[in-house]
Amino acid sequence: MIYAAEEVRARFARRGLSFDPTVEEIVRGILEAVREEGDEALDRFSRDLDGYPVEEVPKRAWREAYEDLDEDLRDALETARERIEAFYREEARGGFLRAEGGGVLAQLVRPLERVGVYVPGGSAPLLSTLLMTVVPAKVAGVREVIVASPPKVHPGVLAAAWVAGADRLFAMGGAQAIAALAYGTGRVPRVDKIVGPGNRYVVAAKRLVYGTVGIDGLAGPTETMIIADGSASPRLLAADLLAQAEHGPDSEPWLLSPDRALLERVEAELSWQLQDLPRAEVARQALEKGGLVLTKDLEEAFALANLYAPEHLSLALSDPLPWLEKVQNAGGVFLGEGSPEALGDYIAGPSHVMPTSGTARFQGGLAVRDFLKVIPVVGLSEGAARELAKKGALLARAEGLEGHARSLDLRR
């Protein structure tokens, strides 16, 4: 269906994360039980919900899974890891130390000690998710990266753990896995931060443990938005929309263009390509969540995109680079038809863990900085302290904090 811009504007403006109180109540009970009972509760929930007790998978099993992979797939995993590493090594992460009046001001940058990575289970093994989360953490210098994935862990996930350089891997899933990582049990160490996507129970658990540990964000269904002009290929546009639509029925694929003829050709192409797509029914449901939008011009298309704040924004334009300055809100941007979002899912370089549900308005994609913390250091000389103490005391008294002011008065 082709929408007018005004038909979707209000919908785009209302976007945000929503949470099911029934799910949160269930998850809260799981978290409390694991926090209080440790491994006993962890195993109980794992048996009841996944059919297996929790176990740590030894590294020899990872190596064997890697060696059993098809040679071409091994090569693809290695290439993906190399590109992810290279991309994130470019990210600035150094602190500074500046001399000032006989003293110093400094900023220390330190990696987190221990990070938990959640890799969902299900019918499709998410090898790429493991690479896209573990590799940036290791580039940042995280000492120990612990992977959690539901039992039985797919051999492809084990192989990816070997390639990515993870440190430990537990066969555990769901809210109970998040609880174990957040609180620690006899077998599972407590981590400093939990990253990675999951179902609504995992997302609810991450939300509830935030504050006990850090989290990367709260992921909703995947979404893609393409802005296209008349130079774009309807065949490629339809394929790119379906690539995201097949993720799940709640995915949102959108195409924005001022060219009605292009939108009509894409609509016809979608019908044609759906005929032999294995996940056609899922994709059809997702296409109903998104749609094709006719805009007045490209300026209006970019205004709508910034309002929507998509996880993925593709610019299928004859000359996309000059339009990059118009992008304010997006998890990741893909320039031109030669840079499809599907490449970003696997091997382009940046992590595919990106903000959804409009949270790209205030949050970026997973990166090295998510595994670092900044510690400011103040070391002033007596002279500098004396010079600043009077003004500092004035500010303290303006806030009604006399104890602060007296502490500073003693330095004058």
Curated annotation (Swiss-Prot):
One of its GO terms (cellular component) is cytosol. NAD(+) binds at residues 118, 176, 199. It catalyses: L-histidinol + 2 NAD(+) + H2O = L-histidine + 2 NADH + 3 H(+). The keyword NADP does not apply. Keywords: Amino-acid biosynthesis, Histidine biosynthesis, Metal-binding, NAD, Oxidoreductase, Zinc. PROSITE patterns: HISOL_DEHYDROGENASE. The keyword Amino-acid biosynthesis applies. One of its GO terms (biological process) is L-histidine biosynthetic process. The active site is at 311 (proton acceptor), 312 (proton acceptor). It is an enzyme of class 1 (oxidoreductase). Binds 1 zinc ion per subunit. One of its GO terms (molecular function) is zinc ion binding. Zn(2+) binds at residues 244, 247, 345, 404. Its cofactor is Zn(2+). Pathway: Amino-acid biosynthesis; L-histidine biosynthesis; L-histidine from 5-phospho-alpha-D-ribose 1-diphosphate: step 9/9. Its EC number is 1.1.1.23. Pfam families: Histidinol_dh (PF00815). InterPro entries: Ald_DH/histidinol_DH (IPR016161), Histidinol_DH_CS (IPR001692), Histidinol_DH_monofunct (IPR022695), Hstdl_DH (IPR012131). Substrate binds at residues 222, 244, 247, 312, 345, 399, 404. PANTHER family: HISTIDINE BIOSYNTHESIS TRIFUNCTIONAL PROTEIN, HISTIDINOL DEHYDROGENASE HDH. Belongs to the histidinol dehydrogenase family. Catalyzes the sequential NAD-dependent oxidations of L-histidinol to L-histidinaldehyde and then to L-histidine. This is Histidinol dehydrogenase. It comes from Thermus thermophilus (strain ATCC 27634 / DSM 579 / HB8). The lineage of its organism: Bacteria, Thermotogati, Deinococcota, Deinococci, Thermales.
